[in-house]
């Protein structure tokens, strides 16, 4: 059984991210060949947010994504279940909350937008998390999910698969404090639903008008959806 096929016990996932927190941002930049910065900017651009609005950045890790979202002028809060990840990002001056994505400590409809970047894949019951995100979003509000996906070009897909399964673990051994975490990363990406399947899941969990935009040839996809106005 692959690591990605495991039950993703929250305690194990938290322990894994706690273990990689210290060098997490550096490792991600190296392993993505610097594309992580582009993906964060694209996520911010996909959100229709500005001053006076409230945004929840879920699975925010060290809050590097939250800091990018804050450039919009909106009030953005970073939430993650790894306290060590949040503490590692302590220098980033955004509010931070330790939270379980399936049981968020927020009232109904308090956010104008919710985003989650490269975190949905790590949640055992990600459909429950999507429903929770819908609960805390106001009617007419929006969701943006930035996640690894399925390359649309066969050549890109072949090269990417080779990188994931061969090169990435080797590079991770050089730059990460826990290389096994990045073997899990590679396997979980391969096991993750494609663009169409994830869009269908959004429709089934309280979100309307799901759509997506491929980034870097479909290696990453930005899925967006709206909270229905009742």
Swiss-Prot record:
Keyword Repressor carried by entry: no
Residues passing through the membrane, by range: none
Top enzyme class: transferase
Pathway the protein acts in: Quinol/quinone metabolism; menaquinone biosynthesis; menaquinol from 1,4-dihydroxy-2-naphthoate: step 2/2
MF-aspect GO terms: demethylmenaquinone methyltransferase activity
Source organism, top-level taxon: Bacteria
CDD domains: AdoMet_MTases
Sorted UniProt keywords: Menaquinone biosynthesis, Methyltransferase, S-adenosyl-L-methionine, Transferase
Residues that hold S-adenosyl-L-methionine according to the record: 62, 80, 100-101, 117
Reactions performed catalytically: a 2-demethylmenaquinol + S-adenosyl-L-methionine = a menaquinol + S-adenosyl-L-homocysteine + H(+)
Keyword Aminoacyl-tRNA synthetase among record annotations: no
E.C. numbers: 2.1.1.163
One Pfam entry name: Ubie_methyltran
PROSITE patterns named in the record: SAM_MT_UBIE (PS51608), UBIE_1 (PS01183), UBIE_2 (PS01184)
UniProt GO BP: menaquinone biosynthetic process; methylation
NCBIfam families named in the record: MenG_MenH_UbiE (TIGR01934), PRK00216.1-2 (NF001241)
Protein function: Methyltransferase required for the conversion of demethylmenaquinol (DMKH2) to menaquinol (MKH2).
Family (UniProt): Belongs to the class I-like SAM-binding methyltransferase superfamily. MenG/UbiE family.
HAMAP family: MenG_UbiE_methyltr (MF_01813)
Stated name of the protein: Demethylmenaquinone methyltransferase
């Amino acid at each position: 059984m692959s690591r990605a096929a495991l039950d993703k016990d929250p305690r194990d996932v938290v322990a894994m991210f706690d273990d990689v927190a210290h060098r997490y941002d550096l490792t991600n930049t190296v392993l993505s060949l610097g594309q992580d910065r582009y993906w964060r900017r694209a996520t911010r651009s996909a959100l229709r947010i500005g001053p006076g609005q409230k945004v929840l950045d879920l699975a925010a890790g060290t809050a590097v994504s939250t800091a990018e979202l804050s450039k919009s002028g909106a009030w953005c809060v970073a939430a993650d279940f790894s306290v060590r990840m949040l503490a590692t990002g302590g220098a980033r001056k955004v509010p931070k909350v330790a939270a379980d994505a399936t049981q968020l400590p927020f009232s109904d409809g308090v956010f104008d937008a919710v985003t989650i970047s490269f975190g949905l894949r790590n949640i055992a019951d990600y459909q429950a998390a999507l429903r929770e995100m819908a609960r805390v979003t106001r009617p007419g509000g929006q969701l943006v999910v930035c996640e690894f996906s399925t390359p649309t070009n066969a050549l890109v897909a072949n090269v990417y698969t080779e990188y994931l399964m061969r090169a990435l673990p080797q590079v991770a051994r050089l730059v990460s404090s826990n290389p096994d975490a990045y073997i899990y990363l590679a396997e979980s990406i391969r096991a993750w639903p494609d663009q169409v399947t994830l869009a269908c899941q959004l429709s089934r969990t309280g979100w309307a008008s799901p759509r997506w935009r491929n980034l870097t040839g479909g290696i990453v996809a930005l899925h967006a959806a709206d909270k229905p106005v009742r």
